[in-house]
Every structure is written in C-alpha cells, then in structure tokens.
C-alpha cells in the first residue's frame, strides 16, 4: 500500500508554461543553463548560479539564497501561481510518436523509509545534502521525481476519460522536439478514487530522481523530529512525483567509452575478447546491439558485435544477468582493469539519446580509445531488482523523455 494525495500545484499560467518549464537541474551544466534561460525560465530557480557574473559556485550560500529570492519573485510576478484546491494532474509526454501518461501527485516520505517506494540505485550523501538544502530553503519540491507503478486498468481508464473529454491546460513542444501536455483533474470523486486505487498498489518504483527522493525523505524526518505536534498529515510529509504505468515506459541504452586499452594493442584486445565472446567484424556501418548479452564495440574505425558465450553470466542472478554487469566483469574489469565505475577516470558514460554517432565521434577524435554500446535494460528487470532489494550498477538506466521542471511544483505552504 502507498499513501498519495492530490496537492495545490504552484505552476505557470497557460500563456507562460512553455517558457517557465525547463530541463531538469542535473542534465545540463551551468554554462548551458545560462545560455538556455529566458526571462521566466525555471532555470533561474533550479540553477540560480547563472544569475551571477561570473557564474557562481552552485553550492555557495549566496546561490542557495538566490534560489529562494527567485522563487518568491516568480510568484509575485505571476509567472507561478498556486491552484486554489488540491488536484491530481495528468502529465503526458510524447517522443517520436510514443506518448506516456503520468499522474502528478504527492507521495509520503514514510513509504520510502518503509520500502513501499523502492529504489534501484545508491545515492551519494553530498548530492542528497545539496537537494535537502534546496527543499528546506524553498519549503517546496520545485522539481518532481519520476516514479513507475504496476499497470492498472482502472487508472488507465480514468486517465483516458479525462484526456478524451477535456482540453489540456498546457500543450507545448520543447526545443528538443518532445511534446508536453497537462490536464487538471478537478472532479473530487475522481481524485478520491485515484487515492483509493493507489492505496491498494503494493509499491512504487523510483525510475529517475533517487537523490531528490532520498532528500525529501530526510527533510520529512527532520520536520517530524522538530514538530512535537506531528500527525503525519502535514504537507512536509509529502513530496512531488510524476508516476507512470510501468508498461508505458522505455529505458534506453546507457553506453561506455574508455580512454585506453590497458596497454593492449587493438589486435590483442580482440583476441582477449574472443575468450568470453563471439566476435564479429561489422565493418564501418554503425552496429546496434540486437538482444540481451549482445554488445557493440567501436574500435579503430570499425564496429564489432560481441555476444557473450553461454556460461559467462548467471541467468538466475538479477544483477549478474544485466548486460552492464556482464560488460564490467568480462571486459572492463577482467581485460581493461577498470575496477570502480564510480571513481575511475579512464571511463565515461554516454546516454543513448545521443546516438551511436556520439560514441564514434569521441573515439575518432582521439579523446577515447574504444566505445561499447549495450542493449537497454527492461522495466521488468528494474522492477525485479528493486523487489529483491538489490542495487543496479552505476549508470545502468537512462529514461527519455525527461520530465520538464516547472510544469507543477509542490509547496509546503498550506495557506
């Protein structure tokens, strides 16, 4: 069972929605944010270092203070307004002809602590602390986390009915070509029914936003400890999530590039790979992995298919069967001596949204020596790992499209 509730979203008026909404804070650097930010962009609130000349340290106190100042200013200017009543919201994203429909809601921090909200990645304390400062200072969840829930026919029917019979509040296409629409569910009975249905759902799954989720839980614990009259119903107990049916989500590949071959020549590397893989030379045309345990390698201007031989992985091990684990064990560790993906300076990671061409570019430029493309993890694999309490290796999942920040915001202000 999970506890959710509708909320009074702080959000832009319709005419400013496309300008206020921005990419999330963690997918662009400060220089990119400064270049992208228009006058009303939420980037001034989630990347406030861009308002300093030169760009300031994003973890400095003046920058944290600027975020609070800007959030207040956006509300006083009318670029962000709070809805008069609590609602759920349908947030639809369209990418390359495929649409996924999520529900914007508030989730209870105690469900994360109890394990009803399940994670699949480790978090870093320094990143948690940074997100905590933002939530604590703003008394709001400015950016949502991205959750998945087991497919539910009744929720699907409710969403379909609202979408069919109501015009969207927002309907815009972002600069990356992805479409974003928002519907407000104003019918109280419908909102009540959504709450009831989710009370019967055994778990939610963190897809993207592990640090924001962990930070929200820590803020909830802090507020609970500091409030002698705590009831568990306070607004600070809840944090903002957009939650999608798992069956609608697609994980795309998250690939690897390496700076050296650990002293091997390309020919020696190929020979060593043949101990664990069936190796096929695919020539100069891009080659994309065709199935689980099939990898693509780009080396010295040529593409290769690497298929792990039987017995090289354990189908009964939810972590060992992952292609990121197979590649790490059989290639990165065993051959290239790259032991820790989190700390090694000899490896970098490239989201599949950039395409195989980005892997080729980085190798051809001389920056990297070889590239490896992986077959994407499935949502069912993610759920299996979360359900068994396991943790995925670093840089395993990449979700697209990303949620736009600023479409809806959750404020702790209950007035």
For each of these PLM feature ranges, what is it?
Residues 1-415:
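Surface-exposed, charge/polar-rich loops and edge strands
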């Amino acid at each position: 069972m999970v506890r959710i509730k509708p909320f009074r979203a702080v959000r832009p008026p319709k005419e400013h929605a496309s300008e206020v909404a921005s990419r999330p804070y963690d997918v662009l650097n400060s220089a990119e944010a400064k270049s992208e930010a228009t006058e009303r962009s939420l980037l001034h609130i989630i990347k406030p270092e861009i308002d300093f000349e030169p760009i300031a340290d994003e973890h400095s106190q003046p920058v944290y203070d600027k975020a609070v100042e800007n959030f207040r200013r956006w509300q006083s200017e009318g670029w962000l307004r709070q809805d008069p009543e609590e609602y759920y919201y349908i947030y639809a994203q369209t990418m390359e002809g495929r649409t996924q429909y999520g529900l914007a809601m508030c989730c209870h921090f105690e469900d994360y602590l109890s394990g009803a909200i399940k994670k699949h990645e480790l978090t870093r304390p320094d990143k948690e602390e940074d997100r905590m400062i933002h939530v604590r200072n703003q008394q709001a969840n400015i950016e949502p986390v991205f959750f998945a829930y087991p497919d539910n026919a009744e929720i699907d029917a409710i969403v379909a009915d609202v979408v069919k019979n109501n015009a969207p509040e927002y309907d815009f296409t972002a600069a990356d070509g992805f479409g974003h629409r928002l519907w407000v569910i104003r019918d109280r009975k419908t909102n009540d029914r959504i709450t009831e249905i989710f009370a019967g759902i055994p778990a939610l799954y963190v897809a993207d936003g592990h640090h924001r989720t962990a930070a929200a839980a820590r803020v909830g614990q802090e507020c609970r400890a500091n409030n002698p009259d705590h009831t568990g119903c306070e607004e600070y107990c809840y944090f903002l999530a957009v939650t999608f049916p798992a069956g609608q989500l697609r994980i795309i590949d998250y690939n690897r590039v390496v700076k050296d071959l650990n002293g091997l020549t390309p020919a020696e590397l190929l020979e060593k790979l043949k101990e664990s893989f069936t190796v096929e030379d695919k020539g100069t045309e891009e080659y994309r992995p065709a199935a689980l345990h099939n990898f693509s390698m780009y080396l010295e201007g040529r593409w290769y298919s690497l298929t792990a031989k039987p017995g090289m992985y354990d189908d009964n091990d939810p972590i060992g069967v992952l292609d990121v684990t197979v590649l790490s064990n059989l290639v990165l560790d065993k051959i290239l001596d790259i032991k820790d993906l989190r700390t090694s300076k000899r490896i970098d990671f490239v989201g599949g949204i950039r395409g195989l061409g980005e892997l080729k570019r980085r190798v051809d430029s001389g920056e990297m020596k070889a590239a490896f493309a992986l077959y994407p993890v499935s949502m069912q694999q993610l759920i299996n790992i979360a359900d068994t309490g396991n943790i995925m290796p670093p840089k395993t999942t990449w979700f697209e499209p990303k949620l736009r920040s600023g479409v809806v915001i959750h404020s702790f202000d209950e007035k």
